[in-house]
């Protein structure tokens, strides 16, 4: 018991000393705009996002096995995509370039299956119908696919880390604009269970 108490007090002392140093450094060291933006405002700039990912836990949790499974899953899905659409061609070319996957051949299973697996269902299909420019279609569909990074989705996080074309803010603006352009949302009735306080059990 005495041993554990000694370790506890030692850890508390070390923590207090480290906190003191951190406080001193915070007072004497100027904070760069990059650090301030990424820490407090969570800027969506692609460069800052990549820096945060490389320096954070996201990079540490990506093991070679995870990347292998990620590549295998994407390769499997890409093999099923129909290459008839120019928008799908552009989108697939970006994914292949991003992950270094070589895809040969195709079937008519198409992009909808890939979209369903990533959880965006019919949104990308509706976007493709409304947007005529193939390049914009590719960007919008890609944005819908990698958007789940906001829910800390592992696959979406890795895609976002490697994707040099779109920022999170651009994805949000494009997806929201396209969803709201022709779809008028009906007001939902009040749901008591949504607003009720949640008690976590430990």
UniProtKB/Swiss-Prot annotation:
<feature type="short sequence motif" description="RxLR-dEER">
    <location>
        <begin position="49"/>
        <end position="61"/>
    </location>
</feature>
<comment type="function">
    <text>Secreted effector that completely suppresses the host cell death induced by cell death-inducing proteins.</text>
</comment>
<feature type="region of interest" description="Disordered">
    <location>
        <begin position="29"/>
        <end position="58"/>
    </location>
</feature>
<dbReference type="GO" id="GO:0005576">
    <property type="term" value="C:extracellular region"/>
</dbReference>
<keyword id="KW-1048">Host nucleus</keyword>
<feature type="signal peptide">
    <location>
        <begin position="1"/>
        <end position="16"/>
    </location>
</feature>
<keyword id="KW-0964">Secreted</keyword>
<feature type="compositionally biased region" description="Basic and acidic residues">
    <location>
        <begin position="37"/>
        <end position="48"/>
    </location>
</feature>
<keyword id="KW-0732">Signal</keyword>
<keyword id="KW-0843">Virulence</keyword>
<protein>
    <recommendedName>
        <fullName>Secreted RxLR effector protein 93</fullName>
    </recommendedName>
</protein>
<comment type="similarity">
    <text>Belongs to the RxLR effector family.</text>
</comment>
<dbReference type="GO" id="GO:0042025">
    <property type="term" value="C:host cell nucleus"/>
</dbReference>
